Structure formats: C-alpha cells, structure tokens
Amino acid sequence: MKIAVTGATGHIGTNLIPTLIQNHFEVRALIHQDFHGPEFPQVEKFKGDVLDPESMEKFTDGADTVIHLAAKISIEKKSPEALQVNIEGTRNMLRASLKTGVRHFIHFSSIHSLKSKPLNEVLDETRSLNLDSDTDYDRSKAEGERMVMEVSGSGLPVTVLNPTAVIGPNDYIPSLLGRAIINLYQGKIPSLVNGGYDWVDVRDIAEATLAAIKSERRGEKYMLSGEWKSMRDLAGTIHRCGGAAVPRFTIPFPVAMAGASILNRMMTGRERLFTPVSLESLRISHRNISHNKAARELGYRPRPFDGTIADTIDWFKKNKLIAA
C-alpha cells in the first residue's frame, strides 16, 4: 500500500513516517525545502505545495491512502495564511484525492475545530464545530473538517483525527509547545498563569493513525486526547526532570495579557508564545476530553504524561536544543 503524507516534516509527521516505514508501507512525503530533520532514505520525497492544485494531483496519483497533516498553526487572532492553507489547501487535497482515485483520506483536524463551551460537559466527537469562531486558526480547522466530512458521502472514504496539545520527542523545529517546555526547563518563564491543556504524546498519535489506516471503518471521527495538566503541573514535572525551579508566582490573566510582550522578549525562538489567543486558550481549555471512541475502535491507549515529558526533555538534550 502506498501512503502519501502532507505535512511530513512537522512534529506529527516526523514521528508518523518511521511508524509507517516499520509497518512496511510505501511512503510518499510532501517535503519543505528548508527542513533539517531526518533524511528517511526509504521515503519518496515530493516537493510541492498544497496551495498548488496541479502539484497535488501529481502528489496523490497512485496513492491508496492520503494522510493530510499539512496546516498552518497560529496563535494570533487574525491569520490569512491559516485561512488559506487550512481551508484552500484542504479543498485542493480533497479534489486531488477524488480525481486520482484515493481510497482513504485521513484528515488531521484539531481540538480547536470544536466549540470549547460548555466546559462542564464531556467533550467528545458529538461536539459542534467552531465555525463561527473569531479566531482564524480555529475557524479554519473547523471549516476544513466540515469539508472533509461533507465529501465522505461523495466517493472518498474519510477518517478525521482530532488531537489535543501534542508534545513528545522528534520535535525538530521545535513546535510552539516544544518551545514552551524548553523555556520552562531553562527558567525563562518567570511566572505562571492558571489553566492548562490536555496533553497527548505524539507517538500515541502516530500509533492511532496506523490503527486508522488498518481499520475498515470509514466516515468516522476520533478525539485523540491524553491527560489534562495545569501549567504548574507541567513546570513541576519539568523540574523533576532536571529543569529550573517551578516559578513561585501565578499571575491573573489580565496581568498576563498586559505583560505578554515582556514575557515574549525573554523566550527563545522567533514566534511569540504569549498572545491573547494562547492565554485565552489556556484559560478555557477543556478538562474532560473523552477518547473513549478511539480506545474502543482503534485500541488507543495514551501513555502517562510524566513519561512523555521525561522522554521529550531527553530528546531535546540529545539533540542539543537544551544543555545536557
């Protein structure tokens, strides 16, 4: 079976590709020219753009399964690039897959595609899409997911996966969440805010994707969650792994909003970590996201949070992203 993977150079992609190779799939990967991660000599590399319909027809031609990971993540309120990549790019992939006879389209959506409220009810696959969000990233992921499920009845069998906050090893870029872990380890975040995320290990995401490929179920959607942990929990686990002391102070959200620009100047990396969008996401993150359906139908069993953090820090050390 040949599998074509967009977003192959991202955090999930660099964990998924080895899993596919180990399971004897032929892999064609959409590669960014500026990627500096593993070479994957067994993989057919394809240079193209999800915004170029013609190149995506060539990319999907001959593939049995397409895994659409490519997306623009943004923690800014407005992001024209997120709208373009996450909506138009997904539309191009769907059209190309239909035209070239792809037999299974696995779409990576996000927890952000779904309405967060009501917070006091379990969040699962029945939660409404966040199509009216005033945040471009959230709305773009909701619209992309809507398009995929709509095509499901039109000749293209689909599966939708909705991971929560993804962390773990093989984070070459590193991701926004990987950078948060690095900065906490190095003591560059002087205070914390209340709130947290549902954290999930990227390796568990890769295994769930493999299970979705092998499953005969189609037209299904799966929440891929892990454990909800506060930022203070995260900082404590990082400290136990040899990182900096846990920041003493927890500041109110209005103060964090006002001081975000100061915090960002203290961080490593070019993109801002603290924005009104990212802080609000921490504040209202859902604490009860059910992965029961994925457990039942895909055999999904997320590993413990503390082990994921330990493995992530160990990987960052081995790759000289933090001092050993």
Model features per residue range: what roles?
Residues 146-169:
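Conserved beta-loop-beta element that borders a ligand/cofactor-binding pocket
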